[in-house]
Amino acid sequence: DERIGQLFMVIANPKSDNRNMQRLMRYVNEIKIGGILFHKGDPVTQAEVTNRLQKASRIPMLVSLDGEWGLSMRLSGTTRFPKNMMLGAIEDNALIEEYGKEVGRQCREMGIHINFAPDMDVNSNVDNPVIGLRSFGENPEAVSEKGIAYARGLESTGILSVSKHFPGHGDTSEDSHETLPVVRHNRARLDSVELLPFKRYIYDGFAGIMTGHLYVPALDKSHKPASFSKAVVTDLLQKELGFQGLCFTDALAMKGASTKKTDNPSVKALLAGNDILLAPAAPINDFTAVKEAIEEGVLDLEAIEAKCLKILRYKYIAGLNAYKPVETKGLSKRLNSPHAAWMAAKLNSEAITVLKNEDTILPLKQLNKKKIAALSIGDGVGNEFQKMLGEYDSIACFSIGRRSTAAQVQQVYNKLQKYDVIICGVHTIRIPESLALRQLAAKKELVYAFFTLPYACKEYKKSIEKAKAVVLAYEGTPLAQEYAAQVIFGGIAAKGKLPVSIPGLYYAGTGIFTEKTRLGYHQPEEVGANPDRLDVIESIVKAGLDEKAYPGCQVLVAKDGVIIYNKSFGYFDYESRQPVTESSVYDLASASKAAGTLLAVMKAYDEKKFTLNNKIS
């Protein structure tokens, strides 16, 4: 029973309530499961559940997570990293490897041994409903390089990587969670596109591959999902391509894995050559079916024992021979480390892509001669994009929402007529391009910023053709919005390259480099500053306010050409009439008091004539 149980990796909700724990404990005690796949939850609860299950299991279990873009894909309160499509825009693959190391570090903190990543699907279908942002792009070479860099980073920390979805889910127009998608390409095309990233991954000797619930007639005409096909899993993956690592099924509860009522999906998957049965809908029933299939000679006992031995070998590789429970104290702080924040910011800043820049309008110049407005489509006024734009100039902000009436939309466009430059942030494709927007593009200097899949640009094709500039941020996260705004004003340089083609507009590989011309706004970690040290500033300012050393102030810290701290406190006078803000204007005399004194204090300090604790008086 234990040998059969090692093949099962059941899905687990990270909840510590009695009903959930009883169900999971039953799997541990009755069928001796070899692993668990955690669903959505929070870090501390998942760690507590992990510890309880591992303590109950005689053989330590492999703990896995579907974390394609890090722990935040499943765990709340963790650092949000970009999805693969955005990473596909980054030129520096060494940075992708460093990112893999950071995800691996976080997995180890959580007691996770397997991350079901990277997604090695080549997304060559603009209508793909399930891959899209999960893919590194449409170029199989680039997908290979970035996927391998990510896997190398993961495995350097002791985490087992699992590439997916073999033999390739990138050119499908259906979702295998709901049905059985069909990949209709011939073998030559499969070899040069879909299979190429997996071949490279296998050559480099990584740990695992997930077989997809896909029907690929060129590989097996029996209408079986690839995950249930001996021709795909055994003959192609293991024998022809030489893969010797762990073969995982995709989740067996998915509709793409449905079989005849007389066929058991776990038995079918093992007959095909898979090693680990991932997330079966009925684990105990499937365990019984596998056991009966062995007794009846349908499944070969020696083959099952070989799979069990392979799993135990990888458990050793993952460090389970020296298992330690997860330390829950301080877990959140360890996960959300300064380095994690730096990594998220760095990935976002490196990916922002400029697709069009007529008359080199970007970065925007001569701000004193232009009236600038920001229009948000699909998001409200005052979002992170518009806030960051406002750090560089006085910006009039407008928005159009899904519920905006035709009259409200026209009113917004009428107001925009008096501005010279209009920066339009597109946050959804559910609001179609309007005639008024095309007219604005023809009359004004229109700068687009898309916070969507690249393919969404084609919905705005006519106005894009007339626009002055197009910036692609790929996602609508706060960091993506902030760095897109900085590219527009020159706070950072644009370095990204488009990872997929946008039909009728831009080819994959398009990317216009722009210059850094102004101070940027970055995380302290990006320039080697300790954010904890910056927190002390607030207490120093508060002490000064309490002692009435000043009624208010603004503190700005810049290092290496970027602003890492900018906050305002108090009022202009002791009557508390006008608050100090980031846009407050000071006369030269006010600035010289601080600047002149500071230089004298610095010199006296260097000459050991003065300490920072001394009073000027």
Locate the predicted segments by residue:
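Active-site-adjacent structural elements in enzyme catalytic domains
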Residues: 43-60, 91-111, 299, 304-309, ...
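Short, conserved catalytic-motif segment at the N-terminal edge
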Residues: 526-588, 609-614
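Short helix- or helix-capping micro-motifs
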Residues: 617
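Short glycine-enriched loops at secondary-structure junctions
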Residues: 12-17, 63-73, 113-123, 163-169, ...
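Second-shell residues forming the walls of enzyme active-site clefts
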Residues: 36, 44-61, 71-73, 138-303, ...
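Preference for extracellular/luminal or secreted protein segments
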Residues: 1-27, 239, 260-530
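N-terminal hydrophobic targeting/anchoring segments and the immediately downstream early-domain regions
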Residues: 1-80, 419, 424, 444
